[in-house]
Amino acid sequence: MNFHSLYDQGFARVAAVALPVHPARPFENAREIIDAARELDTRGVAMAIFPELCVSGYAIDDLLLQDVLLDNVEKALATIVEASADLLPLLIVGAP
Protein backbone atom coordinates (compact mmCIF):
# COMPACT_ATOMS: atom_id res chain seq x y z
CA MET A 1 0.00 0.00 0.00
CA ASN A 2 1.23 3.47 -0.89
CA PHE A 3 0.69 5.68 2.17
CA HIS A 4 0.75 8.86 0.06
CA SER A 5 -1.97 7.66 -2.33
CA LEU A 6 -5.40 8.74 -1.17
CA TYR A 7 -6.91 5.96 -3.31
CA ASP A 8 -4.94 3.32 -1.38
CA GLN A 9 -6.39 4.83 1.80
CA GLY A 10 -9.99 4.37 0.59
CA PHE A 11 -10.61 7.96 -0.48
CA ALA A 12 -11.35 9.46 -3.89
CA ARG A 13 -10.75 12.94 -5.22
CA VAL A 14 -14.02 14.54 -6.41
CA ALA A 15 -14.26 17.87 -8.22
CA ALA A 16 -17.21 20.25 -8.55
CA VAL A 17 -16.47 22.03 -11.81
CA ALA A 18 -17.43 25.59 -12.73
CA LEU A 19 -16.76 26.47 -16.34
CA PRO A 20 -17.99 28.89 -18.99
CA VAL A 21 -21.29 27.70 -20.46
CA HIS A 22 -22.34 28.97 -23.88
CA PRO A 23 -26.16 29.02 -24.36
CA ALA A 24 -27.39 26.90 -27.30
CA ARG A 25 -23.82 25.96 -28.31
CA PRO A 26 -23.46 22.33 -27.20
CA PHE A 27 -20.32 21.59 -29.23
CA GLU A 28 -18.48 24.54 -27.68
CA ASN A 29 -19.68 23.43 -24.25
CA ALA A 30 -18.48 19.90 -25.00
CA ARG A 31 -15.03 21.29 -25.81
CA GLU A 32 -14.98 23.14 -22.45
CA ILE A 33 -16.02 19.95 -20.63
CA ILE A 34 -13.41 17.83 -22.41
CA ASP A 35 -10.66 20.38 -21.72
CA ALA A 36 -11.62 20.41 -18.03
CA ALA A 37 -11.74 16.60 -17.92
CA ARG A 38 -8.24 16.35 -19.37
CA GLU A 39 -6.92 18.79 -16.77
CA LEU A 40 -8.66 16.90 -13.96
CA ASP A 41 -7.22 13.63 -15.26
CA THR A 42 -3.70 15.04 -14.81
CA ARG A 43 -4.63 15.92 -11.20
CA GLY A 44 -5.86 12.43 -10.35
CA VAL A 45 -9.52 13.34 -9.95
CA ALA A 46 -11.81 10.28 -9.83
CA MET A 47 -15.17 12.04 -10.34
CA ALA A 48 -16.02 15.42 -11.86
CA ILE A 49 -19.45 16.96 -11.42
CA PHE A 50 -20.44 19.66 -13.90
CA PRO A 51 -23.36 22.15 -13.69
CA GLU A 52 -26.90 21.26 -14.70
CA LEU A 53 -27.56 21.88 -18.40
CA CYS A 54 -23.88 22.55 -18.97
CA VAL A 55 -24.05 20.86 -22.38
CA SER A 56 -26.96 22.91 -23.75
CA GLY A 57 -26.64 26.10 -21.73
CA TYR A 58 -29.18 27.27 -19.20
CA ALA A 59 -30.69 30.68 -20.06
CA ILE A 60 -32.32 29.68 -23.34
CA ASP A 61 -35.94 29.15 -22.23
CA ASP A 62 -38.02 27.33 -24.86
CA LEU A 63 -34.99 26.53 -27.03
CA LEU A 64 -34.64 23.45 -24.83
CA LEU A 65 -37.69 22.08 -26.66
CA GLN A 66 -36.20 22.49 -30.15
CA ASP A 67 -35.26 19.27 -31.92
CA VAL A 68 -32.20 20.86 -33.55
CA LEU A 69 -30.72 21.77 -30.17
CA LEU A 70 -31.62 18.42 -28.62
CA ASP A 71 -30.06 16.54 -31.55
CA ASN A 72 -26.88 18.59 -31.22
CA VAL A 73 -26.81 17.96 -27.46
CA GLU A 74 -26.92 14.20 -28.13
CA LYS A 75 -24.06 14.53 -30.62
CA ALA A 76 -22.08 16.65 -28.16
CA LEU A 77 -22.63 14.03 -25.44
CA ALA A 78 -21.29 11.35 -27.78
CA THR A 79 -18.23 13.54 -28.40
CA ILE A 80 -17.67 13.89 -24.64
CA VAL A 81 -17.99 10.13 -24.11
CA GLU A 82 -15.54 9.35 -26.90
CA ALA A 83 -13.00 11.98 -25.83
CA SER A 84 -13.09 10.97 -22.16
CA ALA A 85 -13.03 7.18 -22.58
CA ASP A 86 -9.37 6.91 -21.55
CA LEU A 87 -9.49 9.58 -18.82
CA LEU A 88 -9.68 8.80 -15.10
CA PRO A 89 -12.58 10.95 -13.95
CA LEU A 90 -16.13 9.76 -14.15
CA LEU A 91 -17.91 12.76 -15.69
CA ILE A 92 -21.35 13.80 -14.54
CA VAL A 93 -22.72 16.41 -16.94
CA GLY A 94 -26.07 18.14 -17.24
CA ALA A 95 -28.17 17.90 -20.38
CA PRO A 96 -31.88 18.31 -21.12
Feature names for model-found ranges:
Residues M1-P96:
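Hydrophobic structural segments
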